[in-house]
Amino acid sequence: MLEYLIVGQLINTHGVKGELKATSQTDDPQRFKKLKWVYIDKNGSLEKYDINGVKFFKQFIIIKFQGVDSIEEAEKLKGFYIKVDRANAVKLPENSFFISDIIGLKVYDENNQLLGELKDVIQTGSNDVYVVRDSDSKEILIPALKSVVKEVSIEEGKISVILPKGLLD
């Protein structure tokens, strides 16, 4: 499991006093208001930044970090990812998982036959869809429904599913 989770990306400066515009990579952008600090991933090197303020503008988050007080300083952070440590991550309900924790798990059908590896999760609004790549590099799209996904075991590195009839036809 990853120790740090991506929650956003700094995409541009905002104003001249060091604020940054960010996109959210979480289900709930309002979570940024509760954060006291985050880590900025500068090409693999994590630096902790205290948050002085958060506001929202259209679909973006405007963040003010302590010590970033000019457009020039903010410019240096553009493009980097915002991360939180797992201890400060949102607490998930039972049988819910962070996408980053399940990417890479092996997916097996009801006969314990390997279908492939989970490569991505498409969030459709109604239900997620697992993108599974088989050994021939073909993609299988599996709805992430309780009736389909029977077990997720991060410890064992596997997901067990019962495929809907006709899905592989």
From Swiss-Prot:
Keywords: Chaperone, Cytoplasm, Ribosome biogenesis, rRNA processing. Residues 93-167 form the PRC barrel domain. GO terms for molecular function: ribosome binding. Signal peptide: none annotated. Its main location: cytoplasm. GO terms for cellular component: cytoplasm; ribosome. It is found in: Cytoplasm. Binds ribosomal protein uS19. Belongs to the RimM family. An accessory protein needed during the final step in the assembly of 30S ribosomal subunit, possibly for assembly of the head region. Essential for efficient processing of 16S rRNA. May be needed both before and after RbfA during the maturation of 16S rRNA. It has affinity for free ribosomal 30S subunits but not for 70S ribosomes. The PRC barrel domain binds ribosomal protein uS19. This is Ribosome maturation factor RimM. It comes from Ruminiclostridium cellulolyticum (strain ATCC 35319 / DSM 5812 / JCM 6584 / H10). The gene is rimM.
